[in-house]
Regions:
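C-terminal extensions of enzymes
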Residues: 1, 356-405
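Structured beta-strand/loop patches that form or line metal/cofactor-binding pockets in enzymes
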Residues: 3-48, 52-53, 402
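Metal- or metallocofactor-binding catalytic centers and their adjacent structured scaffolds
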Residues: 6, 42-119, 351
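Shared catalytic-loop signature of beta/alpha-barrel
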Residues: 66, 82, 230, 236, ...
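Flexible hinge/switch segments at interdomain interfaces of large molecular machines
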Residues: 128-136
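Metal-dependent enolase-superfamily TIM-barrel catalytic cores that perform enediolate-based chemistry
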Residues: 135-137, 142-254
Length: 405
């Protein structure tokens, strides 16, 4: 692991730091439940993290308190890579380094990076992998017009994007079946035609310089995916996301070879092991990494570096709360071939375009997290978060949960 401030991190006083406690509490700050994690040290420095992608956070809480906490007790937070290996090995029989165990590890890893940054008196993006490539991170909004077949609705969407100052958006396809009720992977010609018209309406409304990603939610068989790729080709999409089912298959190579638009996947993939076949076999044009799923900041950096050697740009998938969003942004700043960072604006608190992914007031951030369509850093050490525990406790704890003190 390369850390440019190693002389600070390896000082005699710093090496005496030990992890003394780990606490967690289930919350709902974004649009899904997530587990906030606090890692305490004998130096009085505390790290904050967030475990996401668990429907009620019970699984992640169990793993953090009963598996991870004993592993980290008395350990040196500077041994981050070794500690992540130990956590991954110990939890591997829960799901082979997939699913909730890795979500739990990731939230704790965020907190460890927060501690390292505070000890070095540097923002995380300065000590992760050699420093940042950018001072702010381009965001894209995941949203869509109320009715893509209505030009008026698309015009309203374009005005909203302009007001919030986004230059890119990810837009869901039109489907006859609701996503959660799908019973097959086939798409009718009528659906394909409606999407061709709908996405053309969106393009006409936002103009040629606005990036549009087409979002498919891993729904289609090969034939449907290829027909849809041709249908949306006239709008020159940023990418066509997850057109085939999750997981590597040789059909991804075939689709990428034959598609007239860039193919992307990654939001459901874990660690380098899942990403590697897509990258080395040319099965995609772009990848996106969900930092909360892929294994944390360090693992995601390794994935991005592998992609870079194959000239594959990287974006993020991000449906987590504000804490994990900040952690993800720090990582994104260190990725040279970075395309865009997902921002969710469905919470009314985010409507003005100055925040995203839930109530940013919990961060104690001091500056707007989102400005002119870019994620911002406040220059503070670690993740730059001063968690407003009073606000979280009063408004965002899951019902029946006990506060971590």
């Amino acid at each position: 692991m390369f850390i440019p401030y190693l002389d600070l991190l390896a000082s005699a006083n710093a090496r005496k730091v030990k992890i003394t406690n780990i606490k967690c509490v289930r919350t709902r700050i974004g649009f899904r439940p997530s587990l906030l994690v606090k890692v305490e040290t004998d130096a009085g420095i505390v790290g904050i993290g967030e475990c996401h992608h668990d429907e009620n956070s019970m699984g992640a809480k169990d793993i953090v308190l009963n598996v991870i906490k004993p592993i980290l007790a008395g350990q040196d937070p500077y041994d981050l890579e070794r500690l992540v290996f130990k956590m991954s090995t110990r939890t591997s029989y829960y799901g082979g380094n997939h699913g909730i165990p890795l979500h739990a590890i990731t939230g704790v890893e965020f907190a460890l990076w927060d501690i390292l940054g505070k000890l070095a008196d540097q923002p995380v993006h300065n000590i992760l992998g050699g420093g940042p490539h950018r001072k702010q991170v381009r965001a894209y909004c995941t949203s869509r017009p109320r009715d893509m077949l209505s030009k008026d609705s698309c015009a309203e969407f374009a005005e909203r994007m302009k007001k919030q100052k986004f230059t890119a958006a990810k837009v869901d396809l039109i489907r006859d079946q609701r996503w959660e009720q799908l019973d097959n992977r086939m798409m009718s010609n009528a659906e394909v035609d409606r999407n061709a018209r709908g996405f053309q309406n969106v393009r006409d409304a936002v103009g040629p310089d606005f990036d549009i990603a087409v979002h498919a939610h891993w729904e289609f068989d090969f034939d449907s995916a290829l027909r849809m790729a041709h249908a949306v080709a006239p709008i020159k999409p940023w990418w066509f996301e997850d057109p085939l089912p999750i997981g590597y298959n040789e059909q991804w190579i075939k689709l990428t070879d034959r598609s007239p638009v860039p193919i992307l996947t990654g939001e459901n993939l874990y660690t380098r092991d899942d990403f590697r076949p897509f990258i080395v076999n040319g099965a995609v044009n772009k990848i996106e990494i969900d930092i909360s799923m892929a294994g944390g900041l360090l693992e995601a950096k390794k994935i991005a570096d592998l992609a870079e050697t194959y000239y594959i740009p990287v974006a993020t998938h991000n449906v987590a709360g504000p804490v994990a969003t900040v952690a993800s942004a720090h990582w994104a700043a260190t990725v040279r071939e970075f395309a865009g960072h997902e921002a969710f604006m469905n919470n009314p608190l985010n409507a003005d375009g100055r925040s995203c992914n839930g109530d940013n007031a919990v961060l104690g951030y001091g500056v707007d997290l989102l400005k002119d369509g870019y994620l911002q850093f406040n220059g503070k050490p670690g993740l730059g978060i001063t968690l407003d525990e009073k606000l979280v406790k009063e408004k965002y704890m899951v019902a029946g949960e006990t506060w971590w003190d």
